[in-house]
Amino acid sequence: MIRSALRNFSTMASFNPTSCSPFTRAVVNSMKKLYPEYLADKSFDNNGLLLESPFNFAERQKNSVLLTIDLTRAVADEAIERGDSIIIAYHPIIFRGLKSLTLNNSQQDSLLRLAQNGISVYSPHTAVDAVPGGMADWLLDMVTGPELTPGSALPHTRSTIHPEQNPPPGFENAGMGRIATLEQPGRLASVVNKLIANLDKPNGIPVALPQGKEIIDMPDIRTIATCPGSGSSILMNNGKPVADVLVTGEMSHHDALAAIENGAAVISLFHSNSERGYLRAVMRQKLVEALRDEWDAVRTQEAAGVGGDIGMIDWLSDSNFTVSVSERDQDPYDIRTIRVDTFST
C-alpha cells in the first residue's frame, strides 16, 4: 500500500527531508501519545526531544529505538554500534542550561558523538511517572497485583497521591505517586519479598524500620505508597508519611527518619532500580504497538515529497522496525558482600 502511494507521487518534487529522520519523528509522536509531555512536572523537569540529529539519507541509521534509564557513555557507545535512530532516555541528559559543548564532559561528549552519528535523544521522564499504568502503578503492581485483576494476591483499591488537575482525555487518573488501601492487612515481610523477587535483587534491598522493630514485627500493613526515583516530595506530607509502607528509589536521610519516627517503613530500591524494569516490562511493548500505526502514517505522509527517488521509495516501503532495551544501562550502586578472610595481611 505504501509502495503504491509512493509510486503515485513519483512525478512530484524531489524529497525534502524533515529536520530529523521520518522514523525518529514517528517515535517521538508515539511517545507523546503514550506519555503526554503535559503531564510532566515542569517545575523542575526537562522532558521532550533533547537532541534532534539532522537526517542524512545516504548515511541513515536503522529504524530502531534503544530504551534506557540513563544515557551514559556506555549506552551512547551501544547505540552507535547498533546504528539506532533514536535513544529514549528516561532521565534527561540535558537537565539544566548548557554554557558549552565540549569533549571534556562525559555527557556532552556523548551528545556530540550521537549527533555526529545521526542519533536523536528523547526524554519522557516524569510523564512516565504520572500516566495511568506508568512507573508508580508498575511498582505497586509488584506488591499488590493490578487493582482490577480477579484473584489478585492482595485485593485493594488505589488512588493517585497528587492527582493531575487537568488531565488530557484518557488520562483521568494521572498524577504523581500511587497509594493502595488493602482490603485485609498485609505483612511487611511479604511486601519486601515480592519486591526482591520481581526486581531480581537476591542480595536484598534497603529497608528503614521504626526503631526497635523487625520486618516480622509489622504484620498489619493497611496502606502502601509508591513513587519511582526520588520519592520524598510525594510520599511525605508536612513531615508525615502518607502510608504505612513507602516504596521508592531513594529518600533523604532526614525524611526517612521522619517516616520511621511516625511508624512507617521505608523501602529504598536505589534510584534507577525503581525505574529500569519498567522499560522491559511495560514501555517496550507499548511503544511497539503505538509505533506500528504511527510509522505507517509518517511513511504515507513522507510519500508526498519523495519524487522519483527509488532508494527513498524502497526505504519508506519498509514497515519493519525494532525497539530494544539497553544491555549496558545499570544503576551505579549495587549491594556486595565481601568475606573478611579473603584479604591477606
Where are these regions (language model features)?
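Active-site catalytic microenvironments in core metabolic enzymes, especially phosphate/sugar-handling
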Residues: 2-345
